[in-house]
């Protein structure tokens, strides 16, 4: 049976794991690393790079390098958070045809789901290379606080990448699975997950194979990227004070500052001070300018203190929803690379009143949990029951623009809930159902997921018709809604598609694009391999021609030289098939040369043997003389 892989699709890095016997195993990528940067780059030559190769060239290609796209997934272009991001990233964020935030590169628009699919394809290929077989099914993780639009967009990304997404699972829940799989005694744990772009806090009761989420809360626009950008702003401001030059308008300089910020942040987790040294960061009439400064851990902590404190309110809300006090939490599990920061650990310790558990790898534990869930769905992992919750309340807009909740936040999923509503006017023959997700009291302050009309209601006084609205949330946290006129039996049912999200036709087109691109990538790789083989063949043939050219006829020599020239011309072109054909031609005409080499080699071997025999005779004579002397 084909394996189900678990993928942690992260803002900064992604990770893939698979069940190996009873344990989840993280798979190394082609560069030998256990995590892959969630970065996609489009080069001037039309090549697409994913992961470490894309990240490596970011400084020289800032506008063509897309990173942290997870922060845009499932978001509208006019979302305030998108506005904030537009000012911080060097690549173009544009309005998609459906009103969502998309990215643009070299005049072509890509949805965040498409970019995410490219990263997922890389993870899929990593797993296939390790397993030696095709992978078609996956469990993909998302932040617990992702809304329906963001979950649906992530599922779409999986489909575009050629994966059947068996389950969308919350990141803290996945981490809890990996942490608690072998724990039999009952515990109440809090999973504090601060990653590259999002923050989640989940409270769970675990024990004897049951993982029950009691509550979850978070912030989908708070993570390591914000810490990096805070440092970038500080570096740029300090440089402006010293040199009078604003680096914020220079995309190349900004990319270098971002890399320096990320490096400084990591170094300050283990040391008290670090030095930022960026020579030739810019230039003016007086010549090149260099950026050199020292940064202490204390200064860094003061710069980001408000970001650290922003994680506390969700923690308070999650405990309140779970009906618990901080002291009733048995263990706090840290997840996400940012939790390596000493200040974060200090704040967590202070809030919960206990040292956090550090026995799991914060970069890998989520992918491992996803792999375990894949094993559960496949039947390989027995006696595990996972009870997750919906992070946000769901409801509809009712008279006066009020948000009427049908399903409260932190309700265990899957779940189904119905409620009967009526008309607001006499003889009203249609109703518009507007579906929202959020916690505000007025509908328009929440996230509009979808709207649809139920028509054909028989004329009647207001308040008489009975319209039954049913919400159904599946195990992925994805919503289906139906409205039914109980008088006529007329029903309208929809699967919520993110307002402005990708239609089935959009997804189908993107799947085709991805397949074509995979074919292009394969063709490009084959072209590179053919070029390498051709250059090696030219080199070896020219070398052999120099050494053994006098052993073949002039005509044969000319044929080989012509074939070499033709192959070199083919290498100047772009057709790998022509290169292959010219290689075969060169190999054919070089056969005589190979024969001459073989004959020369045989003759040399025969001479060597003769020399060896005469040497043996001399040795024998020497031995006999020695014997006589004795």
From Swiss-Prot:
CDD domains registered for this protein in UniProt: ASKHA_NBD_HSP70_HSPA9
Ranges annotated as biased composition (Basic and acidic residues): 515-529
Modified residues (Phosphothreonine): 198
InterPro entries (alphabetical): ATPase_NBD, Chaperone_DnaK, Heat_shock_70_CS, HSP70_C_sf, HSP70_peptide-bd_sf, Hsp_70_fam
GO molecular function annotations of the record: ATP binding; ATP-dependent protein folding chaperone; unfolded protein binding
Chain segments carrying region Disordered: 515-535, 600-630
UniProt keywords, alphabetically: ATP-binding, Chaperone, Nucleotide-binding, Phosphoprotein, Stress response
Pfam families per UniProt: HSP70
Highest rank taxon of the organism: Bacteria
The keyword DNA-binding is assigned to this record: no
Stimuli inducing this protein: By stress conditions e.g. heat shock.
Family affiliation: Belongs to the heat shock protein 70 family.
Alphabetized HAMAP family for the sequence: DnaK
Name of the molecule in the record: Chaperone protein DnaK
